[in-house]
Each structure stands twice: as structure tokens, then as C-alpha cells.
Amino acid sequence: MHIERLTLKQFRNYDELDVSFEPNVNVIIGENAQGKTNVIEAIYFLALAKSHRTARDKELIQWEAPFARIEGAFQKQNGPLSLHVVLSGKGKKVKVNGLEQRRLSDYIGAVNVVMFGPEDLNLVKGSPQIRRRFLDMELGQMSPVYLHQLAMYQKILLQRNHLLKQLFGKANSDPMLDVLTDQLIEVAVEVTKKRFEFIQLLQRWAEEIHQAISRGKEKLVITYEPSVHVSEQLNLSKLREGFYQAYEQKKERERQRGTTLFGPHRDDLVFFVNDKDVQTYGSQGQQRTTALSLKLAEIELMKETVGDYPILLLDDVLSELDDYRQSHLLHAIQHRVQTFVTTTNVDGIDHQTLQEATIYEVEQGSLKKKG
């Protein structure tokens, strides 16, 4: 799949923009704060109905403007597709081929993207929250059912935490807590199951890619660490039983702290290279190779799952990779994946890639094709 045309109105620093893109590599050059990342962000938003930079949609609307609009014309294997998003003070409206989608889970997944920015290099050494977000973003694009289940889980979790805060310091419990606990565990079982299956699929690709980048010297293993024990066979009744055991063990502390202490919102991923925890013992090079392997594995897994390659968004990240890793990344996507690269200059980009790329220059909210 690839995006053929992007139209923006009152989005970030773009008053109006109407630009066409090529199906291979598109390089966007410009100084900082001129609008390079805003283009990437708009494409990302079209795919996921959210920004990778802020949780507040109204920050995307130009100052004092009543709304922002993002439109994209895409070409997929099964034909053309149009996506349309309008942001306003009342929220957001999304359309697929002109038809409004009432649930975001019905919208997300129409187009797939993989984002790789400097912050993604923290995937290995950063907080568990970064790794959970990685899980949710990538799995959510491939499984609308997972997105729906995750939204249900987050809604019940919010209600349960609210009730726990109300019960803080009180001697008596509330029957509603048992109801919400049962509901939370039922959805938690499904979310955990989907994550477990996703990691098993991702592992196969990531191990192969990491081995290639390390020239056969390293073996990468991804371990999913949910808040309760999961057997390799993923027995759902035992998983459910594990959640209830966790609840029994932690319910007094939950009452004392006013928050839920078990469930998918506390999951994590651990990466091992040659049996060593990369976060704790890995070199910076190993951590970056692991992050790169995961991103390339995402691309292959999406192709395998949905039948089409995603769009790759490289936001100011090539300069963070050494020549060897950059070369491996660009070679892996060559002629297969539509790619957007943002950079302040082209000096650090592979010469052959530049020869085949379409170059755009951005300056103060204006984007123009060079040459």
C-alpha cells in the first residue's frame, strides 16, 4: 500500500497543503520547526486516528482555527482507498471512502504504518509503558477485535480504579467491586491471549532479522511478561485462574493504594540477546540492533497478516543509526515499502537511496518537490 496524495487544512503549521507522493522513498528536508515531522504525523494520524507526539488532539488544530482536516488518497492491492479526518473542539470524525465510521476500531487498520523515530530506540531501555504502547499500536492495526477488547479493558479499569479510590480508608467493601473485577478479568484474559500470540509471531521474524544484522553472531529472544503467569500452551482457564489468584493476593494493597495492581496495563516485554537481558547488560549497539530488528519484523508481520506492506515513517532516525544499520534498514525496504524520511540534510543518507528517492523541501508550512 502507499499514499498517493495528502491534503491538510489548518493542521499544525500547515494552513493548506496538497501534495502528491511517490510509491518508493520520499525524503523531506528542512530545518527544525519548519514542519517536517508534521507531515509524518498527519500520515500516522490518518492510519491510527491519534498522534505519536501528543495525546491532545486539539494541539493539532492551528491556533484559533475552528477545525483541522487531514485527507489521504491511498492505493492498496485491492484498489484505491480514501481516508478523511476532521478534528474540532467537539472531537474527531473519521471517514473511509466517504462513509463515517462511528467506532474507531472500525476505522483503524484500513491503512497500516510503522513509525521509527529516535524515541523508538528507547524501546529496549525505556519504561514498560513504551513497550506496551508498541504492542498496542502494532497489534491494534492488525486486529480490530484486539482494539475493541483493549478499549473495553481500559474503560472497566477506569471504573474499577475510581471505585477503589472511593473505598480508600473504608472498612466495608462494595459488591460492585466484585462485578468490575469479574468483568476486568474476562477482558484481561482476551487481551493477554492476543498479545501472547502476537509476540510469538513477531519473535519468528525478529530473530531471523536480528541474526542477519549481527551476521549470525547474535540470537534475539522476545519474552512476554504479563502480570500473571502464562504457560507456553496458553491455557485460558489457567490464565483466568491466575488473574483471580493475583486479585486475591493484591486486593488488600489495592484498597490501600486505590488502584488496580494486576492486569495487562502492567505487562512488559524483555529482550534477550545470546541469553543476556539487553536492557540491563546489552551495549548501545545491541539495544539499537534490537529496536531495528523489531521495526523490520513489524513490517514483515504486517505483510504476512494483512497481505500488504505498511507505509514506513522514518522520523529523523537515520542520523541516529550507524552506516551499517542504516544500510541494512534501507536495503530491507528497497522497492517494496513506501518510505518517508525526514532529515535536516541529506549528508547522512545512503547515496544510492538518495538517487532513487523523491526529495521535498519544507519551509514555514510549505512543502515543495525539489527539481
UniProtKB/Swiss-Prot annotation:
Q: List the disulfide bonds.
A: none
What are the subcellular locations of this protein? Cytoplasm
Q: Does the keyword Acyltransferase apply?
A: no
For this chain, one GO molecular function annotation is: single-stranded DNA binding
NCBIfam families membership = recf
Gene Ontology CC, one term: cytoplasm
Describe its function: The RecF protein is involved in DNA metabolism; it is required for DNA replication and normal SOS inducibility. RecF binds preferentially to single-stranded, linear DNA. It also seems to bind ATP.
- Keyword annotations for this protein? ATP-binding, Cytoplasm, DNA damage, DNA repair, DNA replication, DNA-binding, Nucleotide-binding, SOS response
Q: Which gene encodes it?
A: recF
What are the recorded Gene Ontology BP terms?
DNA replication; DNA synthesis involved in DNA repair; double-strand break repair; SOS response
Q: Does the record carry ATP-binding as a key word?
A: yes
Q: Which InterPro entries match?
A: DNA-binding_RecF (IPR001238), DNA-binding_RecF_CS (IPR018078), P-loop_NTPase (IPR027417), RecF/RecN/SMC_N (IPR003395), RecF_2 (IPR042174)
The residues listed in the UniProt record as binding ATP, with positions renumbered to this chain, are G30, E31, N32, A33, Q34, G35, K36, T37
Q: Name the chain's protein.
A: DNA replication and repair protein RecF
Pfam family name, one: SMC_N
- UniProt xrefs under Gene3D superfamilies: P-loop containing nucleotide triphosphate hydrolases, RecF/RecN/SMC, N-terminal domain
Family, similarity comment: Belongs to the RecF family.
The organism named in the record is Halalkalibacterium halodurans (strain ATCC BAA-125 / DSM 18197 / FERM 7344 / JCM 9153 / C-125)
